[in-house]
A protein has these predicted regions:
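A generic short-segment signal for beta-strand/edge and adjacent turn/coil regions
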Residues: 1-7, 38-42, 62-64, 91-96
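N-terminal auxiliary segments of SAM/dcSAM-dependent transferases
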Residues: 1-33
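The AdoMet/dcAdoMet-binding core of the Class I SAM-like
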Residues: 49-149
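A short, structured beta-strand/loop element
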Residues: 29-44
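Sparse, context-dependent recognition of short Cys/His-centered cofactor- or disulfide-binding micro-motifs
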Residues: 3-5, 28, 40, 108-111
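Pocket-edge structural micro-motifs
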Residues: 21-24, 38-40, 47
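Short, conserved beta-strand segments within well-ordered enzyme catalytic domains
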Residues: 19, 35-37, 71-72
């Protein structure tokens, strides 16, 4: 028997309670929906990710050539990263995520894009503060100062 609602993970973080849950929306013929909550606020839902894909397409459309090095701030449910990896020109993708449990969800394939991102050799995750890294030595601890497209 399929559960209509399931809490997949709960973690206490420095920002508060982080919850990953899955539900089947009966009003949409049982469509599977993933949701992320931080405390009492909804951060993201698999129902609404068109904006993430559109922003990725807009950003990458400005690039030319091959061998793009791309960095994304925030992993979430992985829709931005998955959209970037659809471009064959992306040679390397670094995704910086502030909350370690979010990276763990992808590595454990608890979220829809987990397997896709974790198995793509072009994609790496780093746990950290995107904005602090941008102000510091860069996004790749193994290659300080490296520039990205």
């Amino acid at each position: 028997m399929r559960l209509n609602f399931e809490e997949l993970d709960y973690q206490q973080t420095a920002l508060g309670e982080l919850i990953l849950r899955r539900r089947h929306a009966l009003e949409m013929d049982g469509r599977e929906v993933f949701e992320v909550k931080l405390n009492d606020e909804y951060l993201m839902s698999s129902l609404f990710h068109v904006g993430e894909v559109a922003l990725t397409d807009l950003g990458l459309a400005a690039l030319t050539g091959e061998g793009w090095d791309v960095v994304i701030g925030g992993l979430g449910l992985g829709y931005t990263a998955a959209a970037a990896l659809k471009y064959d020109q992306v040679a390397r993708l670094i995704v910086v995520e502030a909350l370690a449990p979010v990276i763990d969800w992808h590595q454990r394939e608890l979220v829809p894009n987990g397997r896709l991102l974790s198995e793509d050799a072009r994609c790496r995750y780093y746990q950290g503060d995107f904005f602090a890294l941008a102000r510091g030595d860069g996004f790749d601890p193994g290659d300080p100062g490296r520039l990205f497209d």
